[in-house]
């Protein structure tokens, strides 16, 4: 009898513990979700750290999606696509937002969200090499990233060209492979069109060969199971943002201005960053105020190529190419003095920004201000009124850049208060400054990364030296 009671007591203890574990598991399951965990890759158009914080098409969309769900965003960059896949399988992330294209292989492994934008796959080689007209008869292998959409494209092409071969890199990303092309370390790679267009501003030696696949949708990846509600929320969010013009705005912000490319100008700008910018950088930083100093520096390069003695037949002079009336208004005595010119240009640009209507979003105000700096505030206001009369959004840069060139046509400028203006030049002016700015941000990031690597190496060396000294001091 005593043994029976002892067994019954032990069973009741075990049952009670099991019940506590079940209740604890239920509590975890029912605990309200507070953050959206998103996996990503580093990339200028995906996720990047700038002096003004985080940026990137996927980052901005993920931030909006988290807000749409009432969650905070936890966006974690992973080293490779393979690592992203594994993190998804391990349940570490809710979705992947990393500029990845829609492929059959990914459809078989994950659920794919709606299209964010479209890209082409292009074969990339270095300037000076023969244009690769026939992919099946290249003089060297193609090097691509493992688990990328390019593998699927090459596998399909290999069915037609059995002799086609390629190398896979497991520890590199697209930007690293493009840099290897520029350094003559590899002969060919494949990149999506947006990545190529963005990176050739920093590596102007890159050249685009034939398009291997056209119009691939870039999508987000969701878990294959248990993601019905997340997919429903994502589709609702996508329709909302598309109607609001967010997708069009982000496409314009990250991709529109990089399509135009001038090899000679890009090379000259990169040289000027080394030879001229260091002389004036402190002035740009000092007088930028609330502006990003790199936008001010990019504007100065567009105006004068950082030449303090620049002159124009129209009467503008100096680093920031100020008119005499504007210089007087800004309190500038000598337009050819670089410090005064930068101070005056910064103040003038700041004044324009303050004049702009509040309806213009913060992230687009600079483009409106730069257009005004170029052709005058009144002409930009004329273009905004024209945009409104045409059913376009007068406070969206993507719409205003369509209307500005119309100020050169009599049919339109006769309707305006200030008349004719070279609006197409204003569009090119702003696009150029945006490209120069992006390049300055990229170079700053590269320099910071190099400094971090040097500091890490020094720290490791110091730790090894300290351990050696401790070992040497210990008695045998």
Curated annotation (Swiss-Prot):
It is a peripheral membrane protein. Residues 16-258 are annotated as: Non-LT domain. This is Membrane-bound lytic murein transglycosylase F. GO terms for cellular component: cell outer membrane. Residues 456-476 are annotated as: Disordered. It holds the Pfam family SLT. PROSITE patterns: PROKAR_LIPOPROTEIN (PS51257). Residues 1-15 form the signal peptide. Its EC number is 4.2.2.n1. The keyword Glycoprotein does not apply. InterPro entries: Lysozyme-like_dom_sf (IPR023346), MltF (IPR023703), Solute-binding_3/MltF_N (IPR001638), Transglycosylase_SLT_dom_1 (IPR008258). The keyword GTP-binding does not apply. Murein-degrading enzyme that degrades murein glycan strands and insoluble, high-molecular weight murein sacculi, with the concomitant formation of a 1,6-anhydromuramoyl product. Lytic transglycosylases (LTs) play an integral role in the metabolism of the peptidoglycan (PG) sacculus. Their lytic action creates space within the PG sacculus to allow for its expansion as well as for the insertion of various structures such as secretion systems and flagella. It catalyses: Exolytic cleavage of the (1->4)-beta-glycosidic linkage between N-acetylmuramic acid (MurNAc) and N-acetylglucosamine (GlcNAc) residues in peptidoglycan, from either the reducing or the non-reducing ends of the peptidoglycan chains, with concomitant formation of a 1,6-anhydrobond in the MurNAc residue. It comes from Shewanella loihica (strain ATCC BAA-1088 / PV-4). One of its GO terms (molecular function) is peptidoglycan lytic transglycosylase activity. Its main location: membrane. It is found in: Cell outer membrane. One of its GO terms (biological process) is peptidoglycan catabolic process. In the N-terminal section; belongs to the bacterial solute-binding protein 3 family. In the C-terminal section; belongs to the transglycosylase Slt family. The gene is mltF. Keywords: Cell outer membrane, Cell wall biogenesis/degradation, Lyase, Membrane, Signal. Residues 259-476 are annotated as: LT domain. The active site is at 303. SUPFAM superfamilies: Lysozyme-like, Periplasmic binding protein-like II. The N-terminal domain does not have lytic activity and probably modulates enzymatic activity. The C-terminal domain is the catalytic active domain.
């Amino acid at each position: 009898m005593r043994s029976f009671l002892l067994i019954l007591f032990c069973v009741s203890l075990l049952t009670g513990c099991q019940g506590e574990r079940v209740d604890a598991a239920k509590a975890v399951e029912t605990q309200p979700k507070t953050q959206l965990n998103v996996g990503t890759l580093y990339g200028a158009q995906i996720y990047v750290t700038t002096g003004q914080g985080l940026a990137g098409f996927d980052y901005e969309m993920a931030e909006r999606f988290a807000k749409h769900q009432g969650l905070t965003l936890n966006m974690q960059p992973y080293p490779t696509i393979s690592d992203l896949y594994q993190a998804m399988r391990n349940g570490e992330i809710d979705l992947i937002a990393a500029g990845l294209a829609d492929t059959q292989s990914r459809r078989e492994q994950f659920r794919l969200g709606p299209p964010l934008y479209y890209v082409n796959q292009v074969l990339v080689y270095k300037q000076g090499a023969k244009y690769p007209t026939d992919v099946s008869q290249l003089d060297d292998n193609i090097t691509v990233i493992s688990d990328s959409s390019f593998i699927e494209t090459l596998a399909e092409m290999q069915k037609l060209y059995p002799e086609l071969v390629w190398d896979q890199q497991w520890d590199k990303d697209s930007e690293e492979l493009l840099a290897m092309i520029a350094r003559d370390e590899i002969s060919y790679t494949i990149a999506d069109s947006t990545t190529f267009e963005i990176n050739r501003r920093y590596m102007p030696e890159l050249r685009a060969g034939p398009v291997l696949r056209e119009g691939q949708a870039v999508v987000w990846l969701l878990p294959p199971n248990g993601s019905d509600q997340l997919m429903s929320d994502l589709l609702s969010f996508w329709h909302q943002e598309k109607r609001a013009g967010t997708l069009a705005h982000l496409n314009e912000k990250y991709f529109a201005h990089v399509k135009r490319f001038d090899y000679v100008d890009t090379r000259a700008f990169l040289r000027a960053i080394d030879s001229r910018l260091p002389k004036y950088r402190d002035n740009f930083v000092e007088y930028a105020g609330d502006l990003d100093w790199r936008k001010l520096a990019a504007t100065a390069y567009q105006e004068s190529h950082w030449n303090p003695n620049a002159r124009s037949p129209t009467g503008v002079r100096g680093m920031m190419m100020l008119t005499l009336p504007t210089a007087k208004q800004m309190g500038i005595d000598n337009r050819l003095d670089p410090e005064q010119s930068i101070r005056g240009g910064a103040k003038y640009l700041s004044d324009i920004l303050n004049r702009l209507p509040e309806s213009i979003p913060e992230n687009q105000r600079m483009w409106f201000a730069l257009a005004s700096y170029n052709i005058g505030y009144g002409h930009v206001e004329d273009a905004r009124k024209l945009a409104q009369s045409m059913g376009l959004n007068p406070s969206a840069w993507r719409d205003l850049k369509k209307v500005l060139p119309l100020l050169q046509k009599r049919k339109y400028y006769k309707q305006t208060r200030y008349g004719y203006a070279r609006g197409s030049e204003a569009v090119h002016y702003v696009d150029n400054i945006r490209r120069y700015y992006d390049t300055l941000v990229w170079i700053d990031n590269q320099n910071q990364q190099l400094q971090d690597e040097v500091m890490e190496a020094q720290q490791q060396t110091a730790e090894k030296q300290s351990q050696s000294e401790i070992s040497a001091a210990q008695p045998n």
